[in-house]
Each structure stands twice: as C-alpha cells, then as structure tokens.
UniProtKB/Swiss-Prot annotation:
Keyword 4Fe-4S: no
Any one Gene Ontology cellular component term annotated for this protein: cytosol
HAMAP family: Fe_S_insert_IscA
Database matches in InterPro entries: Fe-S_cluster_asmbl/transfer, FeS_biogenesis, FeS_cluster_insertion, FeS_cluster_insertion_CS, HesB-like_dom_sf, IscA_proteobacteria
GO molecular function, one term: iron ion binding
One Gene Ontology biological process: iron-sulfur cluster assembly
Bound cofactor: record note: Binds 2 iron ions per dimer. The dimer may bind additional iron ions.
SUPFAM superfamilies in the record: HesB-like domain
Protein name: Iron-binding protein IscA
Organism encoding this protein: Klebsiella pneumoniae subsp. pneumoniae (strain ATCC 700721 / MGH 78578)
Protein residues bound to Fe cation: 35, 99, 101
Length: 107
C-alpha cells in the first residue's frame, strides 16, 4: 500500500506547514458526498491517531485513517495550475466513476 506525492504537491504541503508553524503532516481521507458517493478530504494533522497509517514521500508525512485507506491505496497527489486556478489533483487507480463536476467519485 502506498500514497505518493509529486514534487509540486510536496513543495506546496511543506510551504503550508511552514506557514502554519506546526504540524505532523497532511491527513488525506474520504467522506460521503456528492452525486457519485465520495469526496476527498485534506487537512493538517498535529498528531496521528493510533489507528492511522502514516506514509512518507518526499519528506511529507501523509496520514490516512483506517476507513479511508482501502479507497486511497495507490493514489498520487499532485498540485497543478490550470489557467488562473490551482489546486491539488488526485490520481486514484481505485476510482470507477466520477460525477460530471469532478467533485465526487465512486470505487
């Protein structure tokens, strides 16, 4: 099982953590949402819980809860700029279907 980050995603997460002034790493998870069933959740974490799994890639610790891990295994997190917009992009090999707006997915 693994979660990987592109160079641009790692740089962006490290910049956010530096601006925040503290933090263990980035929590990546899923929640029920949208028309396709699930949506990604990103937040900073100061201390992982006992049931969390921690991955490290390019110096960034990525924390995933046990319920989300099965849906996120193999995911690559990227940070992209498209025109005037920028944000994190997920490449998840488990996704079977996405909603038209791109906000939610199903595995």
């Amino acid at each position: 099982m693994s979660i990987t980050l592109s160079d641009s995603a790692a740089a962006r997460v490290n910049a956010f953590l530096a601006n925040r002034g503290k933090g263990f790493g980035l929590r990546l998870g899923v929640r029920t949402s949208g028309c396709s069933g699930m949506a990604y959740v990103l937040e900073f974490v100061d201390e992982p819980a006992a049931e969390d799994t921690v991955f490290e890639d390019k110096g960034v610790k990525v924390v995933i809860d046990g319920k989300s891990l099965q849906f996120l295994d193999g995911t690559q997190l990227d940070f992209v700029k498209e025109g005037l917009n920028e944000g994190f992009k997920f490449t998840n090999p488990n996704v079977k279907d996405e909603c038209g707006c791109g906000e939610s997915f199903n595995v």
